Amino acid sequence: MTGTGDVNLKIKEIEMSHLEERFFNFVKKLGRFNKRSMFGGVGLFNEDAMFSLVTDGRLYVRGGGEVDARFEELGCERFKHVKKTTIATVNYFDVTELFEKKPASLLSIVQEAMENSRLEREFKKSKENRRLRDLPNMQLTLERMVKKAGVPDVDSFLEIGAVDVFKKVNHTYGGDVDVKLLWKFAGAESGVHWTLLQEPAKQALLQQV
């Protein structure tokens, strides 16, 4: 029985290896990329911006902007990163079946994901020279609210993330904060106006609050 189990494990490892290799060759069509260890798997980076993840025999591509809605329409699920005591859902979508069955439809999505990740990295690199009120959707009033909640600057805001910033503000102001602030913080984090957030993205944010 053990021998059969070992053989099955070997076969699975070979299949996973072939899948990864085919995906890497697929992504090469869009330009050069680097590989680094991430989340127990391999992260794919273009110009130091991560746009894809390969782990446990599954392929994931980064969401963001209008790409989220396309992933939702195609039935792709978000990557769940299992930590010691919690499960964190991050904005990477499982494209394994899509890659196997409809690779042509995936190519433009991966290209857009690469571009989005580069733009966000550039945005985050420029954060050192920005005030909270300089971020999209933020003004002096919101800057004061966020600082009162214990988030002193842009660097901290982006590191903590929109959901947890909202939680802090909501707690500080007695749990009676307009949910629009969550959209505004999410837009500020992504570098877009909050009205551009798609409904699936809003629902995903709400589920984390």
Curated annotation (Swiss-Prot):
Q: Which InterPro entries match?
A: TfoX-like (IPR047525), TfoX-like_gammaprotbact (IPR026256), TfoX_C (IPR007077), TfoX_N (IPR007076)
Instruction: Print the keywords alphabetically.
Output: Competence
Purpose of the protein: Required for DNA transformation jointly with TfoY (tfoX2).
Stated family: Belongs to the Sxy/TfoX family.
Tell me the Gene3D superfamilies matching this sequence.
5' to 3' exonuclease, C-terminal subdomain, YgaC/TfoX-N like chaperone
- Induction record: By chitin oligosaccharides, but not with polymeric chitin or chitin monomers.
Null-mutant phenotype, please?
Answer: Defective in DNA transformation.
Pfam families given in the database record: TfoX_C, TfoX_N
One GO term under biological process is: DNA import into cell involved in transformation
Output the superkingdom of the source species: Bacteria
Q: What is this protein called?
A: DNA transformation protein TfoX1
